[in-house]
Amino acid sequence: MREIVHLQTGQCGNQIGAKFWEVVSDEHGIERDGLYKGNNDLQLERISVYYNEIGASKYVPRAVLVDLEPGTMDSVRSGPLGSLFRPDNFVFGQSGAGNNWAKGHYTEGAELVDSVLDVVRKEAEGCDCLQGFQITHSLGGGTGAGMGTLLISKIREEYPDRMMCTYSVVPSPKVSDTVVEPYNATLSVHQLVENSDETFCIDNEALYDICFRTLKLSTPTYGDLNHLVSIVMSGITTCLRFPGQLNSDLRKLAVNMVPFPRLHFFMTGFAPLTARGSAQYRAVTVPELTQQMFDAKNMMAASDPRHGRYLTVAAVFRGKVSMKEVEEQMQNVQNKNSAYFVEWIPNNVLTAQCDIPPRGLKMAVTFLGNSTAIQELFKRVSDQFTAMFKRKAFLHWYTQEGMDEMEFTEAESNMQDLVAEYQQYQDATVEEEGEYEDEVLEDEQ
């Protein structure tokens, strides 16, 4: 089967990753000790996508857990899923990266990277037909951002034809953990533009908003935020793990979603999002799902899709839904909001379907949008970067790890190019293409 090897790096990556394995194990009926206790053959049919079977109905996640300090790993190990993972797959250093991208990418992380790659190789060799890798990390810190991107480029070298898919937590405008986030994030995006096939952008602030507004939580914890992320991760891969009428895998997703290789940063969303207690009081319909999923308040990245246009969209419906109704509703959204979809990619909405809904819901949908509005997010980080960089603030932390200012300048201009590319395609219309063709014809005559 088409296996995916999962990596989680840094504190953020490990916390999201742990939550993801909770959700997936629950969906597949895997207990905390790795034993299968489910009640449905469909749970086992494609379980090998994420799990290795090592004995009579005992399953171990194809997961590699990486960090430069032991703290987060210890809490995963002593947490509810501690005994699920292979003990050899915990790879950690002792020194930490101290929120310094250069430490993660060039010094501390580079020392640990070979032992991580050994584990990755081992996992990849245990696969029948490896489809690709997914990595959870944040872009604002040292380990997830610096070492995460180092791992991505190393894996890219070794497995150039496999999909590389990242779930990246981008620094949010108001909630900041460290002052050097803009540096770390810009250096990371510089890497992701070149080395990732699909990057799902997630942002803590947008997640907080969803918790306050929609889920009515007065004091959301990181656990609540990570739960939202894990639902989306589970939704994106649901087609690989369960049967459905319209299945999609990482590569099909990329082919449909990425019109230009550099523009592979997606917004994600999920519907129905209802407050924990009120879910059982109402039935959800396909029109409601469709409407909620395109709602700006549902986006898990802090950029407003109404400020840009969608290049492409993918929707993964789960549960017993009528595909005819889904197609009608999706068409309906496009017709009513045609200004928000670029007209030079006809049929730019992909729909996939899977029969098994998430726990506790009759039907649900996961949304992926490649919208030019994501440039707002990059622009914001880029402006903060420039403000600090022109004063060379905090630079010594990076240069003393052996980095060159040149690399900062390159990362800065790459980020600005990315913003400009999104803007260019946001403004592009079919007419421009037409005018150009007329000129060519005149020249030929």
Swiss-Prot record:
The keyword GTP-binding applies. Gene3D superfamilies: Helix hairpin bin (1.10.287.600), Tubulin/FtsZ, C-terminal domain (3.30.1330.20), Tubulin/FtsZ, GTPase domain (3.40.50.1440). Pfam families: Tubulin, Tubulin_C. The keyword GTP-binding applies. It is found in: Cytoplasm, Cytoskeleton. GTP binds at residues 11, 69, 138, 142-144, 204, 226. Disulfide bonds: none annotated. Transmembrane segments: none annotated. One of its GO terms (molecular function) is GTP binding. Its main location: cytoplasm. Its cofactor is Mg(2+). InterPro entries: Beta-tubulin_BS, Beta_tubulin, Tub_FtsZ_C, Tubulin, Tubulin/FtsZ-like_C, Tubulin/FtsZ_2-layer-sand-dom, Tubulin/FtsZ_GTPase_sf, Tubulin_C. Mg(2+) binds at residue 69. Dimer of alpha and beta chains. A typical microtubule is a hollow water-filled tube with an outer diameter of 25 nm and an inner diameter of 15 nM. Alpha-beta heterodimers associate head-to-tail to form protofilaments running lengthwise along the microtubule wall with the beta-tubulin subunit facing the microtubule plus end conferring a structural polarity. Microtubules usually have 13 protofilaments but different protofilament numbers can be found in some organisms and specialized cells. Belongs to the tubulin family. Tubulin is the major constituent of microtubules, a cylinder consisting of laterally associated linear protofilaments composed of alpha- and beta-tubulin heterodimers. Microtubules grow by the addition of GTP-tubulin dimers to the microtubule end, where a stabilizing cap forms. Below the cap, tubulin dimers are in GDP-bound state, owing to GTPase activity of alpha-tubulin. This is Tubulin beta chain. It comes from Coprinopsis cinerea (strain Okayama-7 / 130 / ATCC MYA-4618 / FGSC 9003) (Inky cap fungus).
